[in-house]
Amino acid sequence: MTDTVETIDYSKTLYLPQTDFPMRAGLPEKEPVLVKRWQDMDLYAKLRESAAGRTKYVLHDGPPYANGNIHIGHALNKILKDVITRSFQMRGYDSTYVPGWDCHGLPIEWKIEEQYRAKGKNKDEVPVNEFRKECREFAAHWITVQGGEFQRLGVIGDFKNPYTTMAFHAESRIAGELLKFALSGQLYRGSKPVMWSVVERTALAEAEIEYQDYESDTIWAKFPVANLVVANVVDGQPAELNPDLSDRSLDLLDAHVVIWTTTPWTIPGNRAVSYSPRVAYGLYEVTAAENAFGPEPGEKLIFADALAAESQAKAKITLKRLHHVSAEQLGNLVLSHPFKGLGGGYEFPVPMVAGDHVTDDAGTGFVHTAPGHGREDFDAWMDAAPQLRARGIDTVIPFTVDDAGFFTRDAPGFGPDREGGAARVIDDNGKKGNANQAVIDELIKRNALFARGRLKHSYPHSWRSKKPVIFRNTPQWFVYMDKDLGDGTTLRSRALKAIDDTRFVPAAGQNRIRAMIEERPDWVLSRQRAWGVPIAVFADEDGNVLKDEAVNQRIMDAFEEEGADAWFAAGAKERFLGNHDASKWKQVMDILDVWFDSGSTHVFTLEDRPDLKWPADVYLEGSDQHRGWFHSSLLESCGTRGRAPYDTVVTHGFTMDEDGRKMSKSLGNTVVPQDVIKQSGADILRLWVVTTDYWEDQRLGKNVLQTNIDAYRKLRNTIRWMLGTLAHDDGETVPLEAMPELERLMLHRLAELDEVVRQGYDAFEFKRITRALVDFMVVELSAFYFDIRKDALYCDAPSSVKRKASVQVVRHLFDCLVKWLAPMLPFTMEEAWLDRHPDAVSVHLDQFPEIPADWKNEALAEKWRKVRQVRRVVTGALEIARAQKVIGSSLEAVPVVTINDAALEAAIADVDMAEMAITSDLVIAHGQAPEGAFTLDDVRGVAVVVEKAEDRGLVKCARSWRYTADVGQDPAFPDVSARDAAVLHELKALGRL
């Protein structure tokens, strides 16, 4: 018999993990295979079939621009969206995702123009619809490329039927939305200062602006007081001025009001000087001067008192304060333009107007007001316009700068009449022109320059060309923000109410967009470009829009069949006007702001597609979209439907490098998602996304990626071990009440985690989920439960209830963890699921497991918190003993545990603590703890001394490697314990030995 025993390979009698699921992931090779599998089976269609009849959940995709390969920001955005749609699908919803693309606009025009220049072609000589056709083909190419890149990230959506803003149906619906604004009277042609890109020759919306450091010329200029207001105006009627006020103002008649500006080129557009009733002003006399130009001794100047000293220093003069000048006196002054008489112009009076935007923080306390070159200037001018007109002052705002940045004839002395030609503000390359210097030279010539300097400050630039923009008065098409819409509301009030009714994640987004809506001007819709949806209206010479529903329908029908190219085709005007007199109506050839395009996507997707619904449950984009897509969608929908097109808005931050710097090619610190995918796999990138506080700016680089790779390996190895263990799963179940406490504790933890997972997905708090699951898998499973149960799982008999219960729990653990993680790591979880269920279609067609209510057991959990406290002291002592080489494996130890805490002792009374500590035996002692015993400060009343099992006469079992007192009791298997001998007999009876 002994000979027989010696021939047994005990390792073959163990239920060791068996799996082909590799430790090395090989994601770059495996993921494309799974992408193709999902595409071949049309997984998205199967998801829709499986969810038929469920409540719809719609995340509406904010359209990326169809230009170039995706970058890391795209990857972050699409992964977050995919996690949301997948998680809601697996939580029992019909969670749809239709990807979309923004196709119109300047960047694509630029690309085509670059191609033209390379071929020696002139865009202006190309028929507009031929140019538009090339733009369309360019966008279509990049939609295909980006669609493939998004799917390689693991994104599941209806990529066979995406939406695009250049689809004929979309162009028809966008035009239809514009026509709704026109019919309701919200659309108007106006003249306002807009941000204008000279380089791009178009007006820009706030969303198309970024701020960069810029060095500007600064000047202090003198405006001479010409006279006093002859008559005041009260309720539109002339009224006598206070004689005393006039008398007190007489000594101001030979004074100058000094202004300060960072845009000298706007002086020809000056029409007023603004002051503040809240600022203290004084009349000052120059007593000494050092400059070759500027004020001379004896001159009288008016400043804000708080800024007189600073102004004095700038001009290198000495000032003496004569007396206070009241706001009432300032309002009584009429100034002359410093360029009066130049080129026969500037003969108009320059009034003083009160303005809320005036402060004494910088400058002189007076603001040079050029209503054609600034929003605040425009507002101050328009507020004062009724009073000014009653005084006989012309309030028409001139067009002093043209679309190329040149001065016009409305700027005498600087326009085409100037020797050498019109001065220019900015050239075609975005560089400063000669306008500032021309203005400064003329001020010096007229002794109107007080001082000059330079200032580095934040200045608006086009986000596309990266070149500075100017504020320029132009005729444009606008949507009113504050016009009564017939029900007592305005577009602004509707939008503000909609913001209050919307859930924002994070909550700070609500205040951010609210502040923008509260302060924003009317919405400028027009762009002077070719590639886009036209402002498809007809207007008379006064700017009145033709309101004819039959005409509008013809336009929309044509766009539906032919696209918006129909507007630019020969004969379009007569075709659409029908019986209207074409000579009375002008066809508007401007195109729409692309933000109106994307702001209308909810119309031709959510409303028009039967697989979607309006409003969307959620919009998710970067935080810059508070002034972009969230903003334009809100305004468009509130203007036509009275509410927002979304219920929830989720925002994410931007991706920085590991040092918190903005990524840029010039710094060489960019992370290219395609490179990460090729080297490590998309699931690594996805793991990074879901473990970040994504609503803030995130950091990414080599070290961050390596941290995620390490975490992924731990997670993967835990899944691999479960798969190996489940190779021995025969599907048997053990009733909950018959399970050991440790198994019931694990089921309780699954019940707790189920709440964390569901609440986390509902709140879009993915980091909360991943932290909980990874900690659970690494700390509670690998280092606790699995470690403890390896003996029972590997060594116990097939009939062992403990082993059966443990296999059953591992089965539940696998099902829950794989499904919970599937939305975040779809490739790895699909691989794991198909390894366990080779005949399955996809884990993504399943739902999260329903956790039985009786798995929750708080009393048991509380007891085991105490058990684990004791265990922690024991394992701490074992680590010390192992480090001191007293023992090798913990199975060589017999800890002697002295307990002087009644609650802890009661908790472990019926627990096999040797099994919990993975030792061969464990002795509970009472009384005084031995000197030198191991303790932990945070676990009072527990002390441990580690003894060796061999010293207690225990013998090592050749099968389980545990040290016991009953090794050799069974003569059939003399080198194993009684437990292991009984198992071997059972295996032999089953024919497995």
Swiss-Prot record:
It comes from Mesorhizobium japonicum (strain LMG 29417 / CECT 9101 / MAFF 303099). It comes from the Bacteria. Belongs to the class-I aminoacyl-tRNA synthetase family. IleS type 1 subfamily. L-isoleucyl-5'-AMP binds at E621. It is an enzyme of class 6 (ligase). HAMAP family: Ile_tRNA_synth_type1 (MF_02002). InterPro entries: aa-tRNA-synth_I_CS, aa-tRNA-synth_Ia, Anticodon_Ile_BEm, Ile-tRNA-ligase, Ile-tRNA-ligase_type1, Ile-tRNA_ligase, M/V/L/I-tRNA-synth_anticd-bd, Rossmann-like_a/b/a_fold. This is Isoleucine--tRNA ligase.
